[in-house]
């Protein structure tokens, strides 16, 4: 980040109410106080010299043609980022949206079509339809891209894959990218198997990182650039947060996706998403998605269990045991794992399914991924900004 090269200062807006964290003693680590003066990157955009100097500031707003990668989480106080930019006179020309769409209502995996925002009339281009990367044609009339999505710190949550493709497209066209940083609600630890890119790379896992990587989306963008996971270097600026502490709780003001509705589900998500590669359900279509696991009438109810402060295989291994018992009693019972390789894509390794089927303990399984995890932690340190 080099803010000196940026000469433009956005017009001051009316005071925006800062989002702040709320306590949740289930997490077991220190919450932020309401008066901690916390501010997201989007809130810090105002008054910072962040727009590229090649574009001139003119009275009435920034006239460089700006594309925004955003969804329902892209808020400045109680106002959407796009509305905030337009009120400031920024020349927003189009919106790119990720999985779940601009309003965050599309189901997981559902195709998101291009559309028009009824409020602003701006075109919305889907990055979760037939193409997941902005095309040269879509960027030909763009001078700058703003990226503002709320991540949850898990490798298989696809917003970081969208970030990868946006960075790649911007780098190829020489377009500056500005990432507005936001907290990682699972940012207080690093754990899980590191993805094997040779065998398990997909849109639910593109980089050699563990399931829980303990970085903000801004830090992750720096790592994509620094580790050369894209061919060309992206002209990247990260607008930092104020008073963000990795070990503090941050209750998201807006649900990041339809099935992560509260802090408890978000904390369980790293542990339960692996079930998406099995014949178990994780509560989709109910009032408690990612707070329980089902296999037929067998239920693992986690709604009232203290939110985990670390990644664990205990839920997966417990349900594997229960399904084994049920299958022994019924020849019609479905196998635990799906026949496809989706579990491997989520786990990031071909080994985990085999290890569980072989009856290995969690401690022994962990020992197999520890060397790669330790190596990642050292790499990660280079890109931490908080």
PLM region descriptions:
Residues 1-26:
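Bacterial Sec-dependent N-terminal signal peptides
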Residues 23-65, 72-78:
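Short N-terminal or domain-adjacent regulatory/targeting segments
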Residues 91-100, 180:
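Short internal beta-strands
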Residues 104-109, 178-200:
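Glycine-rich, charge-decorated loop segments at or immediately adjacent to ligand/cofactor-binding or catalytic sites
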Residues 112-142:
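Glycine-rich oxoanion-binding loops at beta->alpha junctions
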Residues 151-163:
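Glycine/threonine-rich flexible loop motifs
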Residues 200-271:
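Conserved anion/nucleotide-ligand pocket segment
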Residues 294-367:
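Conserved functional hotspot residues or short segments at active or partner-binding sites
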């Amino acid at each position: 980040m080099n803010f000196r090269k940026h000469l433009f200062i956005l017009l001051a807006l009316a005071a925006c109410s800062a989002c702040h964290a709320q306590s949740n003693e289930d997490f077991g680590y220190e919450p932020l106080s309401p008066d901690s003066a916390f501010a997201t990157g989007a809130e810090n955009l105002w008054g910072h010299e962040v727009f590229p100097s090649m574009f001139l500031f003119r009275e009435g707003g920034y006239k460089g043609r700006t594309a925004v990668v955003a969804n329902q989480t892209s808020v400045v106080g109680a106002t959407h980022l796009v509305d905030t930019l337009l009120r400031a006179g920024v020349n927003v020309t189009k919106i790119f949206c990720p999985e779940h769409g601009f309003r965050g209502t599309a189901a997981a995996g559902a195709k998101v079509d291009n559309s028009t925002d009824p409020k602003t009339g701006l075109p919305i281009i889907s990055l979760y339809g037939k193409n997941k990367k902005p095309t040269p044609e879509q960027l030909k009339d763009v001078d700058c891209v703003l990226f503002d999505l709320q991540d949850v710190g898990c490798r298989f949550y696809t917003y970081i894959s969208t970030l990868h493709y946006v960075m790649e497209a911007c780098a190829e066209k020489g377009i500056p990218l500005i990432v507005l940083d936001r907290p990682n609600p699972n940012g207080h630890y690093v754990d899980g198997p590191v993805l094997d890119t040779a065998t398990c790379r997909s849109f639910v896992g593109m980089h050699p990182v563990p399931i829980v990587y303990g970085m903000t989306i801004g830090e992750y963008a720096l790592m994509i650039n620094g580790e050369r996971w894209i061919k060309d270097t992206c002209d990247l600026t990260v607008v930092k947060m104020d008073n963000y502490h990795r070990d503090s709780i941050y209750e998201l003001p807006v649900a990041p996706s339809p099935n992560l509705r509260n802090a408890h589900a978000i904390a369980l998500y790293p542990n339960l998403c692996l079930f998406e590669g099995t014949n178990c359900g994780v509560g989709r279509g109910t009032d408690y998605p990612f707070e329980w696991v089902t296999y037929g009438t067998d239920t693992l109810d986690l709604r009232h269990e203290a939110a985990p402060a670390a990644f664990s295989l205990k839920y997966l291994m417990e349900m594997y045991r229960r399904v084994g018992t049920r299958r022994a009693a019924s020849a019609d019972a479905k196998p635990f794992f799906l026949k496809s390789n989706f579990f491997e894509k989520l786990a990031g390794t071909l080994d985990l399914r085999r290890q569980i089927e072989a009856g290995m303990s969690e401690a022994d399984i962990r020992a197999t991924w520890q060397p790669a995890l330790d190596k990642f932690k050292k790499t990660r340190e280079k890109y931490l900004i908080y």
